[in-house]
Amino acid sequence: MYLARTRFLFFLASLACASIIGTAFYLQQTFGLDPCFLCLIQRAAIIACGVLALCAACHAPGPTGMRRYSLGFLLIALTGLVTAGAQVWLQTASADQLIPFITKLEHLLSLLSLDMCIDRLRSDAMFCAEITWTLFGISLPEWSLLAFTGLALLPLYPLFSEFSHWLATKDRARY
């Protein structure tokens, strides 16, 4: 029964991801909101979460496979969560906080021989720091942060319920 519930949750997650991407494209076309570099990473994470959730729902693996799908989903959702959190921080940080951050990031990219990324970083970091649109006083990166938080919580159910099944089996084996 638990695997059927998990498949249904992953199917709902894939629908949620599809609606999030649809909304992002709608806002881009309707309001002319061009995505910045961090927005594109978040979109890629949402698409990856949606595809992985749909695969988990359609594949119907056993407990080990569902655990693997859940861990992969959790890693992708946490990547999006960190990216959205970084963008929210960029939007709320003052110029005094942004300049040292960008300087350290430029230094890191120069150490990695990614000089072509430095010029793009200067323009994109400032572009990502702009608040271009809000709904109920919440900016788009904050909405993304909320969505990724929900998506990161979803795979915890199969992981913890599998852990509780394992503990129950261990207790029964003792007696």
Swiss-Prot record:
Pfam family, one: DsbB
A GO MF label: electron transfer activity
Compartments (UniProt record): Cell inner membrane
Cytoplasmic side: 1-9, 62-68, 162-175
Keywords for the protein's UniProt record, in alphabetical order: Cell inner membrane, Cell membrane, Chaperone, Disulfide bond, Electron transport, Membrane, Oxidoreductase, Redox-active center, Transmembrane, Transmembrane helix, Transport
GO biological process: protein folding
Transmembrane segments: 10-26, 45-61, 69-85, 143-161
Membrane topology designation: Multi-pass membrane protein
Protein task: Required for disulfide bond formation in some periplasmic proteins. Acts by oxidizing the DsbA protein.
Family assignment from sequence similarity: Belongs to the DsbB family.
PANTHER family according to UniProt: DISULFIDE BOND FORMATION PROTEIN B (PTHR36570:SF3)
Protein known as: Disulfide bond formation protein B 2
Species annotation: Pseudomonas savastanoi pv. phaseolicola (strain 1448A / Race 6) (Pseudomonas syringae pv. phaseolicola (strain 1448A / Race 6))
